A protein has these predicted regions:
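Predominantly a Rossmann-like dinucleotide-binding segment in NAD(P)-dependent oxidoreductases
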Residues: 1-38, 44-47, 55, 61-74, ...
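A structural signal for well-ordered alpha-helical segments within the folded catalytic domains
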Residues: 11-14, 18-25, 142-146, 163-173
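Short, contiguous acidic/charged loop-to-helix segments that flank catalytic cores in large enzymes
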Residues: 43-46, 95-97, 128-140, 152, ...
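C-terminal helix-rich "cap/oligomerization" subdomain common to oxidoreductases
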Residues: 47-48, 151-214
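Short beta-strand scaffold segments in enzyme catalytic cores
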Residues: 53-57, 104-106
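Short, glycine-/Ser/Thr-/acidic-enriched flexible segments
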Residues: 60-62, 86-87, 111-113, 118-121, ...
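Phosphate/diphosphate-binding loops
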Residues: 78-88, 95
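Aromatic-enriched alpha-helical interface/lid elements that frame and gate functional surfaces
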Residues: 103, 107-146
C-alpha cells in the first residue's frame, strides 16, 4: 500500500489520524498539541511507516481551537494517546476490545465514553449510574459535498475549514515526526518547529527531489 512508504504517505497516522483525532478535536475544541511522544513502537525503518505505534500528545488546558461553550472554563491540561496496529488502551474492557476494531475512548472522572462515527457506549462509574443520555443535539453539519458548496455560496466557513483541519492534520503528522526523530517533540505551532529536537527539522520541512514542482 502506497500509504505505508514515507516517500508517498504517512502510514496509519497519516491515513486515519485525521478521522479519529477529529472526534476529540471537535468535541473538546482542541487546537495544535503542545507535544508528541512515542510511548511504544517498533524499530524505525528508513523507508516504511510503522505497522503499530502508541503516541501520547499533550494539549493546553485553555481551548485553543474552536471553543465548545459547554466545556470552556473547566477543561484542564489534556493527554491524548493514539494507538494503531492492533494496540488498544488497557482501560478498554476485553468484551468491547473484541467488538471494536477502531474508535475513540474518552476517559473522564465519572466514567468513560467509547465512540465511533455511528455508535457509542457509555461506561459508567457506580457513582455515575443515574446519568441519562441526552437527547440528540441539533447539528448544522451536512454531507461533505453539500457543506463545501454551501461555504462557496454563502461565504461562511465550512465545518472542516483550514482553521480547524490545519491543527488537526498538524497533530496527526507530529506523531510521525516524533517517531522518525526518536524524541519527544516540544511543539512550536506558530513557527512549525520542534523547540527541543533538531533531528525533527528534516521531517517537518523536507527538501524533495527535483522534478516534482509546479
Amino acid at each position: 500500500n502506497w500509504r505505508h512508504w514515507w516517500a508517498f504517505g504517512g502510514g496509519a497516522l497519516g491515513d486515519f489520524g485525521c478521522h479519529y483525532l477529529d472526534l476529540p478535536h471537535w468535541a473538546l475544541g482542541l487546537g495544535a498539541p503542545l507535544s508528541a511522544e512515542v510511548v511504544d513502537g517498533p524499530a524505525r525503518h528508513p523507508d516504511s511507516t510503522p505497522p503499530w505505534l502508541i503516541v501520547r500528545y499533550e494539549y493546553p488546558g485553555s481551548l485553543a481551537g474552536r471553543a465548545v461553550p459547554i466545556l470552556a472554563g473547566w477543561l484542564r491540561d489534556l493527554k491524548l494517546t493514539w494507538y494503531h496496529g492492533g494496540k488498544k488502551p488497557a482501560l478498554l474492557p476485553a468484551n468491547l476490545a473484541a467488538k471494536w476494531d477502531s474508535g475513540v475512548l474518552f476517559v473522564g472522572e465519572k466514567g468513560m465514553l467509547l465512540a465511533g462515527y455511528t455508535r457509542h457506549v457509555i461506561l459508567r462509574d457506580p457513582n455515575f449510574a443515574d446519568y441519562a443520555d441526552p437527547a440528540n443535539l441539533d447539528s448544522d453539519f451536512t454531507q461533505h459535498h453539500r457543506n463545501w458548496i454551501q461555504a462557496i455560496k454563502t461565504g461562511k466557513p465550512a465545518p472542516s475549514d483550514f482553521a480547524y483541519s490545519g491543527p488537526l492534520t498538524e497533530a496527526a503528522l507530529l506523531g510521525n515526526v516524533a517517531f522518525r526523530a526518536g524524541c519527544k517533540i516540544e511543539w512550536d505551532s506558530k513557527n512549525l518547529r520542534a523547540k527541543n529536537c533538531p533531528a525533527a527539522a528534516e521531517f517537518i520541512h523536507h527538501d524533495y527531489r527535483a522534478g516534482w514542482k509546479l
